[in-house]
């Protein structure tokens, strides 16, 4: 259980931060990890997982080590990373150094734990002093708190030391309490690791345990933590470039929508204009035909109202050479009817002649509507 707790906390707190640009003389103990064509700080730090130092040189060479330089940065890092030109990956004789503080603190805490494991009191004191700096000390303090024993009601904290006896149920409860506190601690670390901060990492765990004579136990856990997660230059640049690309894509989509809307409106207006133009043309055509018909009728009436010249005949005399036939049909009582044909001939320049009529008398055999024998 202690190993699992230490592993989870170590994974949450492990993160490389940029330390500075150092010359090759100011840093030692480095081992070349790889030379990557698309090198970046994030790729190199992934390759150096488990080491305290990750260093980049010549734009594409990655080195790992465990010796953190203590001097001030004195190098000149002007070479851009081959995989991410927005950040620098060392120079011709300088390293861009990134440090994993959790790995450095793990080494310090393990040495402190081995030097103070002789007695229970010393272990408890060591766990109190190292709780704010490492996860290994948190597991050791949980172990020391589980060994506290008492037969009377008490109130203890992580920083206190007690050696009075208690029952085995309290020990199990203390172990459970420590695992709960470590779980809450890892959750807090996960949530805080998404933000960038410049404050130093620190965490404090306070466990208050109250035990009654009837082995009834009440535990209150207070966890306060502030973890610094410095975002590397590559991660910040990647986030900004992704945000700008997202904004550009959003702008293009809005422009496309606006273009579609404007095009639709213009197309509708064009169709409406063509329709109105066609209707206007049809109306003009109809008006022209009506005007032409009126002109023709007027000319015909004008020509018919004029007297034709004397002595003219034929087509040149207008309607004077026309012949009108009128057929009248009727029915009278007592006979089948009669047909009268009237012919009138217009002589040029004169009134019509007297009509020549031909009367057809019905056959008397059909008088009364019955045939006569």
UniProtKB/Swiss-Prot annotation:
PANTHER family: CELL WALL INTEGRITY AND STRESS RESPONSE COMPONENT 1, GLYCOPROTEIN 38. It holds the Pfam family WSC. SMART domains: WSC. It comes from Pichia angusta (Yeast). This is Uncharacterized protein in LEU2 3'region. Residues 15-101 form the WSC domain. Residues 101-171, 183-210, 291-316 are annotated as: Disordered. Disulfide bonds: none annotated. Residues 110-171, 183-204 have a biased composition (Low complexity).
């Amino acid at each position: 259980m202690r190993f699992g707790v230490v592993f989870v906390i170590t994974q949450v707190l492990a993160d490389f931060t940029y330390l500075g640009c150092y010359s090759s003389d100011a840093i030692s103990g480095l081992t070349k990890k790889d030379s990557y064509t698309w090198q970046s700080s994030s790729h190199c730090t992934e390759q150096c997982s488990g080491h305290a130092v990750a260093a980049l040189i010549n734009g594409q060479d990655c080195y790992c080590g465990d010796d953190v330089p203590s001097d001030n940065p004195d190098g000149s890092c002007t070479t851009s990373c081959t995989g991410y030109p927005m950040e620098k990956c060392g120079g011709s004789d300088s390293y861009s150094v990134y440090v994993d503080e959790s790995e450095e603190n793990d080494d310090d805490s393990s040495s402190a734990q081995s030097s103070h494991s002789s007695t229970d009191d010393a272990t408890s004191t060591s766990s109190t002093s190292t709780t704010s700096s490492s996860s290994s000390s948190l597991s050791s303090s949980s172990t020391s708190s589980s060994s506290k024993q008492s037969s009377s009601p008490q109130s203890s904290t992580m920083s206190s030391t007690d050696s009075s006896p208690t029952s085995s149920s309290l020990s199990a409860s203390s172990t459970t309490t420590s695992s709960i506190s470590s779980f809450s601690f890892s959750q807090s670390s996960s949530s805080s690791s998404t933000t960038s901060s410049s404050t130093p990492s620190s965490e404090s765990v306070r466990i208050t345990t109250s035990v009654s004579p009837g082995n009834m136990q009440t535990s209150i856990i207070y966890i306060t933590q502030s973890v610094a997660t410095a975002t590397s230059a590559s991660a910040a640049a990647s986030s900004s470039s992704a945000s700008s690309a997202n904004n550009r894509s959003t702008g293009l989509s809005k422009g496309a929508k606006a273009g579609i809307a404007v095009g639709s409106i213009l197309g509708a207006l064009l169709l409406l204009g063509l329709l109105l133009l066609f209707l206007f043309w049809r109306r003009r055509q109809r008006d022209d035909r009506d005007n032409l018909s009126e002109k023709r009728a007027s000319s015909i009436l004008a020509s018919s109202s004029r007297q034709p010249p004397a002595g003219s005949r034929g087509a040149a005399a207008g309607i004077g050479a026309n012949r009108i036939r009128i057929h009248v049909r009727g029915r009278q009582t007592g006979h089948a009817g009669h047909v009268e044909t009237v012919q009138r001939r217009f002589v040029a320049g004169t009134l019509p002649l007297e009509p020549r009529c031909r009367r057809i008398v019905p056959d008397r055999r059909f008088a009364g509507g019955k045939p006569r024998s």
